[in-house]
């Protein structure tokens, strides 16, 4: 029952995977930036004149943590062609969370209209901490407070308790109702990546907190609920564990099954990069394992998250790329070169949350009167990367 847009995106990603071209993606590419707030809504737009070819949002943008109706109303006027229509719908919605879901879907539609492919991850709250709001006037998800950041709160046996009969099943279903409402408002396909990095143990859905069967059961339940009960037919389901698997067999251990997954991937970050380190070698090995698995199962494949991760620098809350003296200025090109020979269609780096909050692409700090851009030291290598014939950005995909 997949929509035409899903079939088109699937065929496109499959085709790109067979070439030596690679789509460059970024989380929150049009809603968070490290560069000047006087320029566009996107650091890559400032640096190279395009949004990224894949743009990720998270459930945190649906619940008001990373994006909100207020932000849409204040930032998208004059930018989004359908602003007036969206603003009217936001103003008519009765609860704040419904307004936020409308805004997140509108941002996604803006990204799609500008040539990007959408993906949605879920940093879900720990459902043992979710409180009821007492609001029973409208949609189920208005009855719960899903805000805050608790995916790394590891108590509560949450994976078992969100299944039918469990203590948190009703709250989990309400959360999925919110995801479904978002899906129904998106005009196009969404690569939906729930319960990611499940082979590590830093989220409550991680390997230490549920057995293989429970993980598979929760993943299948999620797909069946959205697809069969909520009639969501514009999702492509992405299984995106960490990079722990040392073999195809190990990669398969928590895989939910071919009937529940359209794309497989992995998340792998380059920690404290140095010239001559083994990251690209290890990354290529992991990509080969995932690619082999994908070919055996007839699935799409991608690098679902990557980026550089440095020890937190003085004055920073989080450090991804360094502000200066990065040892691998051509990092984005290095990853493109590692991915291009595989069947992977894209790689996605994480969000530019701010200069002190972690950024994964260079950015512009100011533009001089003569048009000269001043900013992060990796701008020139990134412009070269953008200009490669085989790097794909949104501008290359726009109809």
Locations of the language-model features?
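Aromatic- and acid-rich polysaccharide-binding/catalytic face
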Residues: 55-57, 251-280, 350
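Alpha-helical scaffolding within the catalytic cores
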Residues: 8, 35-44, 103-105, 243-255, ...
């Amino acid at each position: 029952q997949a929509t035409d847009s899903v079939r088109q995106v699937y065929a496109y990603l499959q085709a790109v995977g067979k070439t030596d071209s690679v789509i460059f993606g970024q989380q929150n590419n049009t809603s968070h930036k490290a560069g000047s707030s006087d320029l566009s809504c996107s650091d890559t737009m400032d640096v190279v004149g395009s949004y990224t070819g894949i743009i990720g949002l998270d459930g945190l943008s649906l619940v008001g943590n990373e994006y909100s109706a207020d932000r849409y109303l204040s930032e998208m006027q004059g930018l989004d062609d359908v602003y007036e229509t969206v603003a009217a719908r936001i103003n008519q919605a009765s609860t704040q969370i419904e307004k936020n879901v409308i805004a997140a879907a509108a941002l996604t539609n803006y990204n799609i209209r500008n040539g990007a492919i959408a993906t949605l991850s879920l940093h879900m709250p720990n459902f043992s901490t979710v409180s009821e709001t007492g609001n029973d006037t409208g949609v189920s998800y208005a009855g719960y407070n899903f805000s805050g950041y608790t995916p790394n709160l590891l108590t509560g046996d949450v994976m078992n308790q969100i299944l039918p009969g469990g203590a948190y099943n009703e709250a989990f279903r309400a959360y999925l109702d919110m995801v479904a409402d978002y899906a129904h408002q998106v005009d196009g396909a969404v690569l939906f990546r729930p319960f990611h990095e499940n082979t590590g143990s830093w989220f409550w859905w991680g390997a230490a907190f549920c057995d293989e069967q429970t993980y598979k059961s929760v993943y299948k339940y999620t797909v069946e609920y959205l697809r069969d009960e909520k009639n969501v037919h514009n999702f492509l389901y992405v299984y995106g564990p960490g990079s722990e698997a040392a073999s195809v067999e190990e990669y398969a251990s928590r895989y939910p099954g071919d009937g529940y997954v359209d794309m497989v991937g992995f998340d792998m970050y380059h920690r404290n990069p140095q010239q001559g380190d083994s990251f690209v070698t290890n990354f290529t090995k992991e990509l080969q394992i995932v690619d082999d698995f994908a070919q055996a199962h007839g699935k799409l494949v991608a690098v679902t998250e990557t980026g550089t991760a440095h020890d937190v620098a003085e004055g920073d809350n989080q450090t991804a790329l360094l502000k200066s003296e990065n040892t691998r200025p051509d990092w984005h090109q290095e990853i493109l070169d590692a991915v291009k020979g595989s069947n992977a269609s894209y790689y996605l780096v994480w969000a530019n949350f701010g200069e002190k909050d972690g950024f994964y692409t260079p950015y512009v700090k100011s533009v001089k009167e003569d048009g000269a851009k001043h900013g992060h030291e990796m701008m020139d290598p990134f412009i070269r990367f953008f200009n490669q014939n085989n790097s794909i950005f949104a501008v290359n995909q726009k109809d």
